[in-house]
Amino acid sequence: MKFAKCLTLTVALAIAFAAAALQAQDQRQPAPLVPKFVKGSASDVIAADIFDTIIYLPVKIGGQGPYSFVLDTGNGGTPVLDEKLARALGVPLGTRIPITGGAGSTPVDLYPIEKLDLSMPGLTFSEVPAATLPLDLMDPHWGKHKDGLVGGTVFSVAITDIDYAKKTVRFSDPKTFTPAAGEVIPIEVFGQPFVRAKVFLHGSSQPVEAFLMVDTGVRVTTFNSPFSKTNKLVEQSPKSLATMTGFGINGASWGTIGRVQAIELGSIRIENPVVDFSTDTAGALSSDRFAGILGADMLRRFHVVFDYPGQRMILEKNAEFGAPFEFDMSGLRLVAEGKDFSRIKVFHVADKTPAQAAGLQAGDEIRTVDGRKASTFNWETLRAYFQRPGRTVKLEIVRDGKPIAATLTLERLV
């Protein structure tokens, strides 16, 4: 199941490298990117594919496509294409740059792209600097293929209206934008948007101030390891689970899943959220320059408008606002392999969990879940299936070519 929080942070650092590489190749200052709205001062209302809280939009590259791009505030720089797609399209690539910086420490290759033409329904950009990364490395952990990421290029010049409930996105010209209903939350934009929030801990009436990156490309809200350690966040959580929490293009990330009493944004109070307390000692989640990440599992509870030029975010509660925060109750971290993501395998088993008690191991392939073929689940339905406390789940797995039966009883782990 997908906890790919570090991908976008790695990408943010990668884009900095790409920008430096492009500047070295051409000392001229690039002209500001100007979006062209095909009809008036706004794009079409774009039907978004919101899968596991992550927003996928149709994007054309040089008139070809559309391809599936993640709309990602965590990508504060230029768009990112999957390297295989860029090569298939014959896009000219610059000099290879090995990078690290997110989850894990294994270098991967970035290639700068001097310019691309990008378009979405009702909106076009010409000659946009971009970069490639091997985004397909993340596909098994996301349970879905992505062709690219688009973020700061659009957010910096267009008002972005995201209606999670209706699964739509619309971009507007800041000059003609009329503010929507909802609470205005000030943001500070440093490539990515940041908010100042109050974090209330269990057992304390005094909040902790937190400077959080707002990231639509991350599911679970995460606190960086220095912030978690300084404020003893793990100790205050009523229950917690130490486990693998992320897998970025540079490798795995580790942390402790737990809860805080509440997070406040302006006058909006979000009760008892599930959060990740990072224990990383290297990479972006070990940074003390910001407290952590406000993820999409919180954002999906609102109609969200990002107004970078106006330094504000507008939040209007939707029907999901009061829904409880839940987390996996099995102890399994799964990956989906194969062209259609139909092969479900165990990637990691957390200690002292139902999955460990049932004898499940990394590498096991799950064939059936309560008699139903595992391939008939998608990421969202499978996650929901493992989030019901007290449910007994019978699995048929294959290990070393041999079928094995396993039974586990789900329990609330955080």
List each language-model region with its residue ranges.
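Bacterial N-terminal signal peptides
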Residues: T8-A18
